[in-house]
Amino acid sequence: MENVYVGIDVSQRKCDASIKDRSHNELVEPIVFEPNMEGIDKLLKVVTEVCKRLKAEPIFGMESTGIYHLPIYAELTALDYTVKVYNPTQINAFSKKSLRKTQTDKIAARTIADALSYEGVPRER
């Protein structure tokens, strides 16, 4: 089964998510959601639709952001999704490989999704 890679840029008040395939194609417009249960449900609705259409399994990735990523991480792992938490230094180093130097929340989410797809399937659950 194929995978789709969901990169999430987490902050205190909002999150941006990018959903990409193995070829780094963005499958839907970036999703903006609040870091609460309603926001996570909004994200999962879109992810579920994409995965159903492509017959794929999602892999989620996010940076460790102190406490802000923890509720999203806890909910996704409780639902038995594969989730990779990156040290921000890893994502910073990965993003330096890009020619694009502008950094926005949407670009950060795309970078995390790309890092997931290059890395392959993480083993953490």
Give names to the regions the model predicted.
Residues 1-125:
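Phosphate- and other anionic-substrate recognition elements at nucleic-acid/protein interfaces
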